[in-house]
A protein has these predicted regions:
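A generic structural signal for short coil/turn motifs at secondary-structure boundaries
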Residues: 55-59, 91-94, 286-290, 322-325
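Intrinsically disordered, low-complexity segments enriched in small/flexible residues
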Residues: 1-44, 49-51, 198-288
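Active-site mouth loops of central-metabolism enzymes
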Residues: 53-60, 121, 355
Length: 418
């Protein structure tokens, strides 16, 4: 087993290769997901492994519930968690049910991370969509040269942006953009190893030995680091400007009178003069990139720092994350998970966080806003999708099924219909 390829192994084999000999217990399978417990250097760990052969995403309803349960158990017992991720994210053919289940799973992941649960992501070959959000929420990530991590996979980037954005069949270009070596250069918490059982096991053992001395998550430091990355890639923030007058009528009805609204890098923001309420919006109808996500996270951090207990309402009308070379170059997944962590931190510190869906909502942007929210409200005209329709058609080779607004409630992607 020493020289076998880690990423090519079955989920159960990957789990067994990581833990101390004779320590494996509680091995179980939930859908396509494998879970077991064991020790690494005599320290108790729970290990989760996805199945890379699951078509259209390996994180369905069953798998999401199983991971949520393990995170809860691990937090209660103070046992570290290792996620062996090789997945395109939420299972597309389960539609909204998978999206709703992933929303709940990601909420557990955010709360576990903020509570200090040690989490390690071992990246197999493909880690896209929701799986990449799980990975970038973890304390640390380990890649090999065979690893690929991105918010949007190569096929989705090409489907939505054309081959001029990225040729999904150009292995060199894909590796240069989202391969393990490229990703480890982005973050000081990430490591690169050989794609063998021995090297991944060594990385897991080094992590578990050092985990007690690892610094606590500092969202402000993380925000500063991500901002420097944007600047290094030519994405400088713009100064705020007054919001346009022709805001959607439904938004004008909701917002309190006299509020001063501004926009900055695609983010609408303003504060009520009559009550402790902050309002933000991603409502321009365009896919959201790293700079916009970072800007919103910064405004929300300011609420937490300067205005304790202030309620936060976010309005959403956008078709999801930006499937662009430029945004994946800076590792969009890390920006999306950072925003989600900031919002979850606000909720945990007494801020009421509400998401209101005005129009389109899809993919990782929806999850990053909905998972930490106390409530998600859907206004007339809301359209929730697991991915933009063109991306679903590219992956599944068929159109997504039509849905009724009542399906949103049943699936758990919305809490209240207005």
């Amino acid at each position: 087993m020493e020289e076998e390829v880690f990423s090519a192994s079955a989920p159960a084999e990957r789990i067994a290769s990581l833990v101390d000999n004779g320590s494996l217990t509680g091995a179980a399978q939930h859908g396509t997901l494998h879970i077991a417990s064991g020790t690494i250097e005599a320290r108790q760990v729970n290990v989760i492994a996805t199945n890379r052969h699951a078509a259209g995403g390996s994180l369905g309803v069953i798998e999401a519930k199983a991971i949520s349960a393990i995170l809860e158990q691990s937090s209660a017992a103070h046992h570290a968690v290792i996620l062996c991720l090789d997945s395109a994210g939420a299972r597309l053919d389960e539609g909204l049910a998978a999206l709703g289940a992933f929303r709940q799973l990601y909420r557990h992941m955010l709360d576990s991370r903020l509570a200090g649960l040690p989490t390690l992501a071992l990246i197999g070959r493909h880690c896209f969509g929701g799986a990449s959000m799980l990975a970038t929420t973890c304390s640390q990530r380990v890649y090999s040269d065979a690893s690929r991590l991105a918010m949007s996979g190569p096929a989705v980037i090409q489907a939505l942006g054309g081959s001029g954005e990225l040729d999904a069949n150009d292995a060199f270009a894909v590796t240069l953009l989202m391969g393990g070596a490229a990703r480890t250069r982005m973050s000081p918490a990430d490591h690169l190893c050989d794609d063998t059982h021995a090297d991944f096991r060594r990385a897991a053992r080094n992590w578990i030995v050092d985990v007690a001395a690892a610094p606590a998550l500092d969202l402000r430091q993380q925000h500063t680091r991500l901002g420097k990355r944007l600047l290094a890639h030519g994405m400088a923030p713009s100064p705020p400007t007054n919001a346009r007058d022709d805001l959607p009528a439904v938004l004008q009805e909701i917002l309190p009178p006299g509020i001063e609204l501004h926009t900055m890098d695609g983010v609408l923001f303003g504060r009520s003069k009559s009550s402790p309420n902050a309002f933000f919006g991603l409502i321009e109808g365009n896919p959201v990139g790293a700079l916009t996500v970072w800007t919103l996270a910064g405004e929300c951090l300011a609420v937490g720092d300067q205005r304790p207990g202030e309620a936060v309402t976010i309005f959403l009308d956008c078709p999801g994350q930006a499937p662009t070379f430029r945004d994946e170059l800076v590792m969009l997944s890390e920006y999306v998970s950072h925003l989600a962590l900031v919002l979850a931190s606000l909720r945990r510190n007494g801020h009421r966080v509400t998401l209101q869906l005005l129009g389109d909502a899809a993919g990782g942007i929806y999850v990053a806003l909905a998972a930490p929210a106390a409530r998600v409200l859907a206004l007339p005209g809301a359209n929730v999708q697991i991915l933009p329709p063109a991306a679903i058609a590219r992956v599944l080779r068929r159109r997504s099924a039509s849905t009724d607004v009542e399906d949103y409630m049943r699936a758990g992607v919305v809490d209240t219909l207005i």
